[in-house]
Amino acid sequence: MKQGIHPEYKEITATCSCGNVIKTRSTLGKDINLDVCGNCHPFYTGKQRVVDTGGRVERFNSRFKIPSTK
């Protein structure tokens, strides 16, 4: 690598809104705040909700007179 053209790589702390603290390295050079992390994200905690779009599909099919495949 050429000297003097690359940004400085520093250790920073990423703090989540749930209180989880993650130490990492970045060229940003300052600590950051996160909205979600692996400890509080619904996908990783198992609290994910499935959105049912069946009503919208049925409405579309009835609007365009497409027979149901069920």
From Swiss-Prot:
It comes from the Bacteria. Pfam families: Ribosomal_L31. InterPro entries: Ribosomal_bL28/bL31-like_sf, Ribosomal_bL31, Ribosomal_bL31_A, Ribosomal_bL31_sf. Zn(2+) binds at residues 16, 18, 37, 40. Keywords: Metal-binding, Ribonucleoprotein, Ribosomal protein, RNA-binding, rRNA-binding, Zinc. The keyword Oxidoreductase does not apply. Its cofactor is Zn(2+). GO terms for molecular function: metal ion binding; rRNA binding; structural constituent of ribosome. GO terms for cellular component: ribonucleoprotein complex; ribosome. SUPFAM superfamilies: L28p-like. GO terms for biological process: translation. The keyword Ribonucleoprotein applies. PROSITE patterns: RIBOSOMAL_L31. Belongs to the bacterial ribosomal protein bL31 family. Type A subfamily. Part of the 50S ribosomal subunit. Binds the 23S rRNA. This is Large ribosomal subunit protein bL31. It comes from Haemophilus influenzae (strain ATCC 51907 / DSM 11121 / KW20 / Rd).
